[in-house]
């Protein structure tokens, strides 16, 4: 990895997506993250493997359309997001919730 990419690792992964569908996918060892919309699959894979110390065996990405929002008479668009569904090797796990 180049030094430029090393400094960007934490910027590629924005946050985990916690929805009912994403929570059900945890049983299949699949984790859903919101990522930078310019990131490619190899960059996402390298970032997940480096940040969480796991082995990624597959990535599916999606670019949902931007939604239009209105505030009074002004119309605008929300920022572009990209979601990545990451499938981990058997036995690997990412701790999303703190254990109690």
Curated annotation (Swiss-Prot):
Assigned keywords, A-Z: Ribonucleoprotein, Ribosomal protein, RNA-binding, rRNA-binding
GO cellular component, one term: ribonucleoprotein complex
Family annotation (InterPro entries): Nucleotide-bd_a/b_plait_sf, Ribosomal_uL23-like, Ribosomal_uL23/eL15/eS24_sf, Ribosomal_uL23_CS
One GO MF term attached to the UniProt entry: structural constituent of ribosome
Cited Gene3D superfamilies: 3.30.70.330
GO biological process: translation
PROSITE patterns membership: RIBOSOMAL_L23
One Pfam family of this chain: Ribosomal_L23
Record-linked HAMAP family: Ribosomal_uL23_B
Oligomer status and interactors: Part of the 50S ribosomal subunit. Contacts protein L29, and trigger factor when it is bound to the ribosome.
Family from the record: Belongs to the universal ribosomal protein uL23 family.
Function, in words: One of the early assembly proteins it binds 23S rRNA. One of the proteins that surrounds the polypeptide exit tunnel on the outside of the ribosome. Forms the main docking site for trigger factor binding to the ribosome.
Protein name according to UniProt: Large ribosomal subunit protein uL23
């Amino acid at each position: 990895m180049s030094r430029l990419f090393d400094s960007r690792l934490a910027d590629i992964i924005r946050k985990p997506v916690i929805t009912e569908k994403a929570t059900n996918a945890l049983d299949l060892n699949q984790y859903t993250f919101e990522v930078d919309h310019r990131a490619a699959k190899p960059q996402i894979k390298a970032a997940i493997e480096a940040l969480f110390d796991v082995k990624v065996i597959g990535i599916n990405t999606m670019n949902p359309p931007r939604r239009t929002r209105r505030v009074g008479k002004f119309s605008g668009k929300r920022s572009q997001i990209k979601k990545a569904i990451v499938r981990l090797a058997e036995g690997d796990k990412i701790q999303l919730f703190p254990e109690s």
